[in-house]
Regions:
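Conserved PLP-binding catalytic core of the aspartate aminotransferase-like
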Residues: 19, 297-307, 311-347, 363
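Conserved PLP-anchoring active-site segment centered on the Schiff-base-forming lysine
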Residues: 113-132
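N-terminal "arm"/small-domain region of PLP-dependent enzymes with the aminotransferase-like
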Residues: 7-69, 203
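PLP-dependent enzyme catalytic core of the Aspartate aminotransferase-like
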Residues: 53, 57, 61, 65, ...
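Conserved small/polar residues in nucleotide/adenosyl-binding loops
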Residues: 1-9, 370-377
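Active-site phosphate-binding strand-loop segment of PLP-dependent enzymes
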Residues: 146, 150-207
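Conserved core segment of the aminotransferase class I/II
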Residues: 235-237, 244-296
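Conserved N-terminal alpha-helix of the aminotransferase class I/II PLP-enzyme fold
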Residues: 57, 64-105
Length: 379
């Protein structure tokens, strides 16, 4: 009861400012918070597609033509359209996989993928810093799981040996799960080294590339493309919520595996089909990413200037080698709240913070992005 009282007091104090703040205006480098125009550091609109005129036009036309209700029903029953199929074909072709399956949401989609792929006899080996959606998916797994040290290939090899022995005993398989780009630190999963371990161990590899799709690899094809190991990734998951500036996700791989997911993923079997405006909008976003590699090139120009400037000004950005740009500071919740207030009230900068338990105790990460205001950001 005491903990509930503390929680309730915190929620009452924090709501609307530290938690659930309301940003207003067009999505961009400057937005309005509590009536004041601010430089916005808290966006993941990597390629700037959120307000692209062709994207806004496609979204509006999709809504005008079909409304938000169509198609009615789950895809297996009455929610299938030629547009859903077209988007799946184009996504699979773009990332270099045989087939793809659309998902309504990224977070619950990943949970359902893991639930669908595994039996109690199967064994999972996953990175210690895997995203919360992966952890929640593994909570549904009734079999054994092993965690390896973040990006530590010696640790992975050791856990793979344990997993292999157990899987052979149980007559199951081994699934390794990692990320293409880790969203808190910005470092890349060592996909090339993980794929190389297939020479010594039998396992399938599932990669969550939410932050890599559109930003990494040839033309934005993702982190597996960056490492040249697309064929070695068995199950590739991507979301529309980052580079695509939309909603939804997709999973891709060999056709037999995608069909297994298509006919068995509970989050899709028992859910309404992705609404038509989202599908029409995603087709336009993919077209722009595919036909305009300069969007990715511009992103990386900004990233290089931003990260170099931050380091030159004495900020610790860790080991990021992606557009994710964390700034590591020492402190806990009191220091983080003071910093949020200082940035917003005294400097006109809207910024959100990440603290323990999302990151190690005693650290703070301002979640930050900026497109057009690099000098102000670095200062």
């Amino acid at each position: 009861q005491r903990q509930m009282c503390i929680r309730d007091r915190y929620m009452s104090y924090a709501h609307g400012y530290y938690a659930f703040p309301k940003l207003e205006g067009d999505i961009g480098p400057h937005m309005t918070f509590r009536g004041k125009k601010m430089l916005n550091w808290s966006l993941n609109n990597y390629l700037g597609l959120a307000n692209h005129p062709e994207v806004r036009k496609a979204d509006a036309e999709g809504a005008a033509q079909f409304g938000m209700a169509a198609p009615m029903g789950a895809r297996m029953m009455s929610g299938q359209t030629v547009y859903h199929e077209q988007l799946e074909r184009e996504l699979a072709e773009f990332v270099g996989k045989e087939d793809a399956f659309l998902l309504n949401f990224g977070y619950q989609g990943m949970i359902s993928i893991i639930d669908c792929l595994l039996t109690p006899r199967d064994v999972v080996v996953y990175d210690a810093e895997a995203h919360a959606c992966i952890i929640d998916g593994l909570r549904l797994h009734k079999g054994k799981r092993f965690v390896y040290g973040h990006n530590d290939m010696d640790s992975l090899r050791l856990q793979l040996q344990h997993a292999t022995d157990l899987a052979e005993e149980q007559k199951g398989g081994v699934l390794v799960i990692t990320e293409g780009v880790f969203g808190m630190k910005g470092d890349l999963g060592k996909l090339d080294e993980i794929v190389a371990l297939k020479k010594d161990f039998q396992f399938r590899l599932l990669v969550d590339d939410a932050h890599g799709f559109g930003t990494m690899g040839e033309g934005g094809r993702g982190t597996a493309s960056h490492f040249g190991v697309t064929d070695g990734v068995d199950v590739l998951f991507n979301t529309f919520a980052k580079s695509m500036a939309g909603i939804g996700a997709f999973v891709c791989g060999p056709r037999w595996l995608v069909n297994l997911l298509r006919y068995n993923m509970r989050s899709q079997l028992y859910a309404k089909s992705l609404p038509m405006p989202m599908v029409i909008g995603a087709l336009k976003r993919l077209e722009l990413i595919r036909n305009h590699p300069e969007y990715q090139q511009k992103l990386w120009e900004i990233v290089r200037v931003l990260q170099s400037s931050l380091k030159e000004n004495g900020f610790e950005i860790g080991v990021t080698n992606s557009p994710v740009t964390p700034v590591f500071l020492k402190g806990g919740i009191p220091e983080a709240t003071n910093l949020v207030v200082d940035l917003r009230e005294n400097h006109g900068i809207f910024c959100s913070m990440v603290v323990y338990p999302v990151i190690p105790k005693g650290e703070i990460i301002p979640v930050s992005y900026t497109h057009l205001t690099l000098p102000t950001t670095s200062r």
